[in-house]
Amino acid sequence: MEDENFEHNFRLAIQSVPKEDYEKSMCFRFRDDQIATLVSRLFLRQASKRFTGAKWEEIEFNRTQKGKPYLVTPSGYNFGLNTSHQGDLTVFASSCTSEVGVDVMRLDMSRGDKTADEYINSMAKSASANELKNMRCQPTEQMKMTIFYRYWCLKEAVLKATGQGIVDDLSRYDFRIDTNDRYKQGNFLTSTTLLVDNEFQPKWVFEESFVDANHVAATCRTKNLTKSCTLYGDSDANKMFFSKVNFGFLLDDSCILNPLPGNGMDAYNNFLQKPKKN
């Protein structure tokens, strides 16, 4: 997002979200987190505008007690929206029903002084016995960590789809992956299934892919969709990979909701003073 138009787009973006969203984004210490939060809000608003045909300023959101966003105005819609940010990316997913969740992870291979096995052992309480076995049996450090991030994305995605958020025991969520599938960039996988407390959960579809060479993502949605839904039925045409967008897309047909003094110059300078994570 940092191009020659970044300053203009940033100053427009912080004024194109409600005041409370702007203020929340400004609270973050790092630039990365501020941008990610801002982009998440723009994704939700831009998608809702396109799905409903409503004007930018007419759209209103609320959040559940666990923090999951949902559309309030215009009313009468039941589609789901979700965002996630980690590493260098913010991702967005939607579905025809309200139950949809997405998660993204950067494939960080540096773990301080820990080997992959040591790192996995330190996180063992979040994994089932089956998941731990699959992680530990991988032949290389990189493959072990890639599978760890894969499982983590899946767990986050289903918890966001259900709206549960953080749970005490992630090991109850036991994902079964098809070892015959190639988990690599360019592939789109939907074969993964879920057991919760050893009971199969047929309700969910998990869509897994690499956003780019350094980031993996998982989307969770309900399997049974209405016939009016664009994704109704199973076919290769429904394999929707993530596409990268820019500020121009996110701000299309936007308007000012949060006018700032100096057209946002002070806020932009404040942003520049913040450190980057990496």
What label would you give each PLM region?
Residues 1-278:
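Core catalytic alpha/beta fold that binds nucleotide/phospho-ligands
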